[in-house]
């Protein structure tokens, strides 16, 4: 019994830094029928967990009660634990990338629409400019055509207007001579071809009344 007490005390002295979870049963509570060999076998069994716990406490310098080691996380556990954040980190960029792609496509469509609109506006402006040029050319041609008769009539009027007294006397002589010739011609026609003259006069009257 003294030997057992000594071993228990040694075990307690080794584990002073951390209290042990398992307590050794008192010697008086042991059954009397157990042999000494069985008692010697039980004492080392009790010492092993206390030594392991003391080693854990000495390594970690924990003044409190012994803490159980965390379970080793294998690759499966690590993968399961990382499934949540991994999925979130993979799923979150997808909508952002899709939204960015949609925004780029919308911007591209808008730019194409603006380019097409500018193209049609340029074509319309060019067509309007050509139409205005053609209309200006037509107006110039009409003005030139209208100006030619005025110029000719003006030049003819300038030509017919007498520049001096001699020209006016010459015009009067020509006018009197034309009147005299016309009178002689009419008298000659009536005297020689009165039937023809009457027929011509009747035709002119009928045409005037008919119209």
From Swiss-Prot:
GO terms for cellular component: endoplasmic reticulum; membrane. Residues 119-148 form a coiled coil. It is found in: Membrane. Pfam families: TMEM247 (PF15444). Residues 1-90 are annotated as: Disordered. Residues 1-10, 31-45 have a biased composition (Basic and acidic residues). Keywords: Coiled coil, Membrane, Transmembrane, Transmembrane helix. InterPro entries: TMEM247. It is a multi-pass membrane protein. Residues 63-73 have a biased composition (Pro residues). The chain crosses the membrane at residues 159-179, 186-206. PANTHER family: TRANSMEMBRANE PROTEIN 247. This is Transmembrane protein 247.
């Amino acid at each position: 019994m003294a030997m057992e007490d000594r071993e228990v005390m040694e075990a307690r002295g080794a584990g002073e830094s951390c209290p042990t979870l398992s307590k050794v049963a008192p010697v008086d509570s042991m059954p009397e029928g157990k042999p000494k060999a069985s008692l010697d076998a039980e004492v080392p069994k009790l010492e092993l967990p206390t030594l392991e716990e003391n080693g854990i406490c000495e390594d970690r310098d924990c003044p409190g009660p012994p803490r159980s080691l965390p379970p080793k996380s294998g690759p499966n556990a690590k993968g399961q634990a990382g499934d949540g954040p991994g999925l979130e980190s993979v799923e979150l960029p997808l909508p952002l990338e899709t939204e960015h792609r949609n925004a780029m496509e919308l911007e591209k469509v808008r730019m194409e629409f603006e380019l097409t609109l500018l193209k049609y506006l340029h074509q319309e402006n060019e067509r309007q400019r050509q139409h205005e040029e053609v209309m200006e050319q037509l107006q110039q041609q009409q003005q030139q055509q209208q100006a030619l008769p005025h110029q000719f009539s003006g030049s003819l009027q300038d030509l017919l207007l007498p520049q001096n007294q001699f020209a006016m006397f010459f015009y009067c002589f020509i006018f009197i001579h034309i009147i005299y010739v016309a009178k002689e011609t009419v008298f000659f026609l009536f005297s020689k071809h009165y039937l023809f003259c009457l027929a011509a006069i009747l035709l002119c009257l009928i045409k005037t009344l008919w119209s």
